[in-house]
Amino acid sequence: MDSNYNYVHMNKPGVVLFASDWLKDRLPVDDVEVRVEHLPPVTEDEMTIQHSSANLILMKNKQLRHEPAWKDLELEDLVNAFAFIQGSSNAEGKNTIEDNFETDPFKSVKEAPMAPFLEANRRHQGEHASMRYFR
């Protein structure tokens, strides 16, 4: 393999004379001939006829094929669904899931670790109302 790095063993004194030339030598850039069955598939962009409005047509087709992304990830519903599992404990260390749910059903949601992230997400969506998709 001529294109891979390798070590030169200086076991003969004449090798030193050619070492600098060997490091400077570059392989020529040649076209590699590949059989038809080994070629990659042709993309749609290469199959189309190139004319002045070809790029506009391709962009419009891509926009029509684009599926809209989710805007709402429904993280609040996810936190609400699993917040009662976490629960909280009272002074004796006993679990008081039922007590918390009866007094304030959203208390465990407010104490959930995802609450700050949900609040930041709400603020971000409010500031960027013109944003259409999450990327």
From Swiss-Prot:
Gene Ontology BP, a term: cell division
Pfam family, one: Apc13p
Keywords: Cell cycle, Cell division, Mitosis, Ubl conjugation pathway
Keyword Cell division: yes
The keyword Cell division is annotated on this UniProt entry: yes
Gene Ontology CC, one term: anaphase-promoting complex
Subunit structure: The APC/C is composed of at least 13 subunits: apc1, apc2, nuc2, apc4, apc5, cut9, apc8, apc10, apc11, hcn1, apc13, apc14 and apc15.
Similarity comment: Belongs to the APC13 family.
PANTHER family xref list: ANAPHASE-PROMOTING COMPLEX SUBUNIT 13
Function of the molecule: Component of the anaphase promoting complex/cyclosome (APC/C), a cell cycle-regulated E3 ubiquitin-protein ligase complex that controls progression through mitosis and the G1 phase of the cell cycle. The APC/C is thought to confer substrate specificity and, in the presence of ubiquitin-conjugating E2 enzymes, it catalyzes the formation of protein-ubiquitin conjugates that are subsequently degraded by the 26S proteasome.
Name of the protein in its database record: Anaphase-promoting complex subunit 13
Provenance organism: Schizosaccharomyces pombe (strain 972 / ATCC 24843)
Gene expressing this chain: apc13
